[in-house]
């Protein structure tokens, strides 16, 4: 069945995206404006390597750098298709730069990537946006191990390569889920932060923790676009609220941390009247109303699937809003804990967590050796990895429910 409407919020106006998440203005306008000349000067004289540059946040960061005319901008991502779209997007929006702009479809964990760095490793700034970000990726031990490789060990490796090549600065993304983590994804980023502390004694590293990026690839809101195009029900939890930033805001936050962050700084969006919690179900309702549909609440998955064949012609869309009961869902969000030191005065809408280089070498070695042994055996269980995570993070709030998002619509 042809969908009655092809709609993509990313290509729609920023105003629409902002109104869906309950805002009228971009969060970081004043900070970007205040530092725009300094940003332009630094970027135009610098070389950049963006890793994971074809994901939603990676594309946003790449565009923020590109539009300020860098001397050199090389982008690496494992997704060949997303990389093609990034280049098309940049050429269509900004055109060309005087500097050297190239993209490479490489796996950061591969030998080919290491050869690329050996041949082309001279960059002032290295930004790593690659991650396995989904809570559902902890459902099986094999994807979970890949999450550890991507989120922890690839980060550690690429920092060492940056140190060896004499880079000025390394930036990578953490997550709000690293503050008091309750899922393996958040915990993997918390462990990554521990490894960063060790490497920060050899080079300047800054990071960012931020909220959900509205309509980023693979996100629930991005799924709304897909469901409409495929004429399928809209499904969302009605008991989970999140902070949302737009893709452009995610790029600005990363860029500000990369350029202006001091060693071990973690940047995050300040909570304000503009940035407030909003539920997925509320966004779903606004989203459908923007498209001219009235939400029709269903009781079961089967009812919603069946009604998707008939309701759209009546100007209604089937929705299933239920309570969340899957492993790893955090019912609130936080960017910092009460144990962390904050600088809330340097920027208008950006907060900064200040860190000393605190880490336990024995714990990091234990983690490396334990994972290495599991890999050598070619056999491991999720329970083994969870136990190791609890050793690394004693107050880890993980609760296994046995239910995962892959078993739900």
Model-identified regions with their sequence ranges:
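Conserved Rossmann-fold NAD(P)-dependent oxidoreductase catalytic core, especially the SDR/UDP-sugar
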Residues: 1, 128, 132-193, 198
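Flexible, Lys/Arg-rich cytosolic regulatory linkers and terminal tails that connect or flank
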Residues: 1-45
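Strand-loop microenvironment adjacent to phosphate/nucleotide-handling motifs in alpha/beta enzyme folds
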Residues: 38, 196-409
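Conserved glycine-rich cofactor-binding loop
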Residues: 54
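Hydrophobic/small residue at the entry helix of a nucleotide-binding pocket
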Residues: 57
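NAD(P)H-binding glycine-rich loop region in Rossmannoid oxidoreductase-like domains
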Residues: 60, 64-75, 91, 99, ...
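Helix N-cap at the beta1-alpha1 junction of Rossmann-like dinucleotide-binding domains, i.e.
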Residues: 77-82
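Hydrophobic/aromatic anchor residues within beta-strands of the central parallel beta-sheet
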Residues: 103, 147, 205-208
